[in-house]
């Protein structure tokens, strides 16, 4: 049970153990893309969030992933994007795109603040 107020009703608030510390993030699943207006409202809520500083969007397809991630390209918050199918197979090793550093990297690196990149074909997000 959470004992703090959050700005948005997220699909889940997840806490994982990384090495010597815990990392908490908001998890959102996007099966289909929303309108730009809806995403503008969501981005505003996430920008105003004070209790959570990391966010993960998992998408059902490449088309949805591109649409969702593009809406957050100017966000000042740490929002990462990946595929639900990868999450099921790899969990913390899921490759996520991170607009803060404009690269793909393992989710565990994104949660720990590491800037370690991974190699992904350049056309993946072209």
Feature names for model-found ranges:
Residues 20, 33-126:
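Non-catalytic C-terminal interaction segments of nucleic acid-processing enzymes
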């Amino acid at each position: 049970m959470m004992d703090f107020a959050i700005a948005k009703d997220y699909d889940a608030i997840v806490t994982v153990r990384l090495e010597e510390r815990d990392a908490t993030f908001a998890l959102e699943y996007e099966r289909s893309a929303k309108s730009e207006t809806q995403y503008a409202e969501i981005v505003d809520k996430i920008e105003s969030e004070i209790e959570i500083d990391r966010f993960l969007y998992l998408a059902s397809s490449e088309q949805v992933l591109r649409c969702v991630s593009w809406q957050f390209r100017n966000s000042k918050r740490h929002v990462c994007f990946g595929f639900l199918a990868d999450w099921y197979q790899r969990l913390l090793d899921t490759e996520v795109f991170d607009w803060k550093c404009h690269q793909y990297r393992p989710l565990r690196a994104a949660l720990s603040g590491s800037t370690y990149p991974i190699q992904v074909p350049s056309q993946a997000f072209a």
